[in-house]
A protein has these predicted regions:
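Exposed, low-structure sequence patches enriched in small/polar residues
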Residues: 3-357
Length: 357
């Protein structure tokens, strides 16, 4: 095996206790101890406590503990609770090799159901303390998430979500502390209009993502900012065997040294034919892309799916596609382009595992 890979072993023993009281009150607690050997090739050590007969301690064996406790109250329309989690500096498990140890998390969790069950909010808010045992390198990080759904009427609903997650340590000097933190915000309104012959569904979504990363050698923090907007329109005909859909996608990504912009327009139509034995779907997609100050790229894709039902369990599936891409002036020669055409066909057989009577 590669010299960088070492034989390892570990064991975790945990004790879980849950207590539920009247009127929705609860208390949950868990304690765990890990004994982990980073390299089985190291010599045995009598100075480290073994966990026989499971593990015999080596010089690379470490033992530590972790604990988690939660207390709160659950109700029909309101949940409120507090959770505290601690992972010791030497706590490590085989199943999660990248688990961030030596940290303390405390969270306030809540769920709110209001407005005659038309509004639902699930949120958590708290703080993470890293390097708990090392005061000089101790760092604090905000953690939280939110999911807020509201059904304003039969025609309009709105969903808002926010997530913050990542890894952060205090910034020292050469090497500097690690920082990989992401903040994501999403807004998704949906409109539905119902007529006698058609149902109109309009869905819009906007997502903003900010990812900060610190270089451990230079100490510089770079940000990756992404904006994504999507507009989708799906009409459903109640008296026709056709299903069209239309969408517009906007994507913007800004990182040091590169700004990428994409705009995609898509239209598709699916229908049944040959007494519903054949299903057809065609799609046309055009993408306009731009990198920094170079001229725009152009991409046109046309595709078609043909599924023909030969028997109850056997289907003949065919896929056709043509892809035309024209580059901007970021490469030489300017205006370079290519056309790619593909055809894929095959048979699909569905096996029925139900027993015949």
């Amino acid at each position: 095996p590669p010299l960088t890979i070492r034989p390892q072993e570990g064991i975790v023993i945990s004790l879980v206790s849950d207590l539920y009281l009247e009127q929705g009150f609860y208390f949950k607690a868990e304690g765990a101890q890990s004994t982990f050997t980073k390299d089985l090739a190291t010599p045995l050590s009598p100075n480290v406590k073994s966990l026989k007969p499971f593990i015999e301690a080596h010089t690379s064996t470490i033992t530590d503990f972790a604990a988690q406790a939660a207390v709160g109250k659950k109700g029909k329309n309101l949940d409120l609770g507090v959770m505290v989690k601690y992972l010791g500096a030497g706590f490590q498990t085989i199943g999660y090799p990248f688990l961030q140890s030596d940290r303390l998390d405390y969270l306030l969790n809540t769920r709110i159901n209001a407005w005659k069950n038309k509004m639902n909010i699930v949120a958590s808010l708290g703080q993470r303390v890293n390097n708990v045992k090392n005061t000089a390198l101790r760092a604090k990080q905000f953690i939280g998430n939110l999911n807020w759904f509201t059904q304003f009427s039969d025609k309009f609903s709105l969903n808002i979500n926010y997530n913050n997650f990542g890894f952060q340590t205090a910034s020292g000097l050469n090497p500097f502390g690690i920082k990989n933190v992401s903040n994501d915000l999403g807004i998704n309104p949906t409109f539905t209009f119902t007529g006698k012959k058609i149902i109109h569904l309009i869905s819009m979504s906007y997502n903003y993502s900010k990812y900060d990363e610190r270089d451990v050698m230079t100490g510089l923090t770079t940000s990756n900012n992404t904006h994504t907007g999507l507009l989708t329109y799906v009409p459903t005909y109640l008296e026709k065997e056709i299903s069209p859909d239309f969408s517009i996608l906007y994507f913007y990504n800004n990182v040091p040294g590169a700004k990428i912009t994409l705009a995609t327009f898509s239209a598709a139509l699916s229908m049944q034919a040959a007494k519903k034995k054949m299903r057809l779907r065609g799609q046309l997609q055009y993408t306009l892309g731009k990198l920094n100050s170079f001229s725009s790229n152009n991409n046109l894709i046309a595709s078609c799916n043909i599924d023909f039902k030969l028997t109850k369990k056997l289907t003949w599936a065919t896929f056709l596609t043509t892809n035309y891409f024209k580059y901007g002036n970021e490469i030489i020669p300017n205006g370079a382009n290519y056309v790619e055409t593909g055809c894929r066909t095959g048979f699909q057989y569905r096996f029925d595992t139900k027993k015949q009577k």
